[in-house]
Curated annotation (Swiss-Prot):
<dbReference type="GO" id="GO:0045087">
    <property type="term" value="P:innate immune response"/>
</dbReference>
<keyword id="KW-0446">Lipid-binding</keyword>
<dbReference type="GO" id="GO:0042742">
    <property type="term" value="P:defense response to bacterium"/>
</dbReference>
<keyword id="KW-0964">Secreted</keyword>
<keyword id="KW-1052">Target cell membrane</keyword>
<keyword id="KW-0732">Signal</keyword>
<feature type="signal peptide">
    <location>
        <begin position="1"/>
        <end position="16"/>
    </location>
</feature>
<keyword id="KW-0391">Immunity</keyword>
<dbReference type="GO" id="GO:0005576">
    <property type="term" value="C:extracellular region"/>
</dbReference>
<keyword id="KW-0399">Innate immunity</keyword>
<keyword id="KW-0472">Membrane</keyword>
<protein>
    <recommendedName>
        <fullName>Defensin gallicin</fullName>
    </recommendedName>
</protein>
<dbReference type="GO" id="GO:0044218">
    <property type="term" value="C:other organism cell membrane"/>
</dbReference>
<dbReference type="GO" id="GO:0016020">
    <property type="term" value="C:membrane"/>
</dbReference>
<keyword id="KW-0211">Defensin</keyword>
<keyword id="KW-0929">Antimicrobial</keyword>
<keyword id="KW-0044">Antibiotic</keyword>
Length: 68
């Protein structure tokens, strides 16, 4: 199930739910997606606030700034 974010980007609602649990939630979500590099949650004031990205560690600056 995909939804449109405020930025007009399709975001998996499960990723959004995991993000609400913080870094650990994203890492778990990414693990179950078969990605073992951890995860990160989009930070405030970025275009990807409230969703998980799975191509970086939980504390990687590029991940938090959504400069992927």
């Amino acid at each position: 199930m995909w939804i449109e974010s405020d930025a007009g980007v399709a975001i998996d609602r499960h990723a959004r739910g995991a993000c609400s649990l913080g870094e650990a939630g994203c890492a778990t979500y990414c693990f179950y997606q078969g990605k073992h590099h951890g995860g990160c949650c989009g930070e405030n004031y970025t275009k990807c606030l409230g969703t998980c990205y799975c191509n970086g560690s939980g504390y990687e600056y590029r991940c938090h700034s959504c400069d992927l």
